[in-house]
Amino acid sequence: LYGPPGVGKTSLGKSIAESMKRKYVRMSLGGLHDESEIRGHRRTYIGAMPGRIIKNIQKAGSSNPVFILDEIDKVTQNTINGDPASALLEVLDPEQNFAFHDNYLDMDYDLSKVLFVATANDINAIPKPLLDRMELIEVSGYITEEKVEIAKRHLLPKELSNTGLDITHPKFKFTKAAFEKLIESYTRESGVRQLEKQINKLLRKLAYKQAVDNELAYESVDPTKLEQLLGNPPFYRDIYQGNDY
């Protein structure tokens, strides 16, 4: 799964696990530079332990989990401690992964039942041999209307719960215009990561006012109230946005 940050690639992997009723496990590959982190250390080394693949399989408690390889494009190649990308070839290649060898266990382990889902921002940074062993699915960025629905259905309820505000308050409203202004004037991204942070920031300010005044500070959040709470917007919608030139 490849696409810009914040578009839900990792969340999509978790949803795949839920829909298949399989265990879910995630392994971040960002900054991985040592092959032994994949294959494990031989027992002759002090502090030796199994590789992260086997440790995560153990953590899942299942031989057929959905295994997320997060940020596979960030793996370091050709280091003095071995090439992690080459070790991942054995993990992902169906011709080899039925007998994946972990140095600590000193035995082969069958990974063929595992569903590996890799995520990346830039597929050009992934070594070609690895890329050839994966099916590529692009996860594109969201348009404003999609972000509004994501914020309304998922982000706002989640952050309301996190900040302890009364989510059942009958008069509390977050207008569509406020969502649109938040998206277009306070964030500039393909995904919704910064949008979630801005919603959290806004609700923390409301929670503080509620704690001080013992009542919900604003019954309705509109674009004007938005500026009062978050200050002047750092971005402005492009004048020609939406035009055909």
Predicted features, each with a name:
Residues 3, 40, 71:
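The Walker A (P-loop) glycine that initiates the GxxxxGKT/S ATP-binding motif of P-loop NTPases
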Residues 18-49, 56, 76, 146:
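AAA+/P-loop NTPase substrate/partner-engagement loops
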Residues 60-68, 100-120, 170-173, 219-221:
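AAA+/SF3 P-loop NTPase mechanochemical coupling elements
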Residues 69-109, 113:
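Conserved catalytic/switch belt of AAA+ P-loop NTPases
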Residues 193, 197-245:
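C-terminal engagement/docking regions of AAA+ P-loop ATPases
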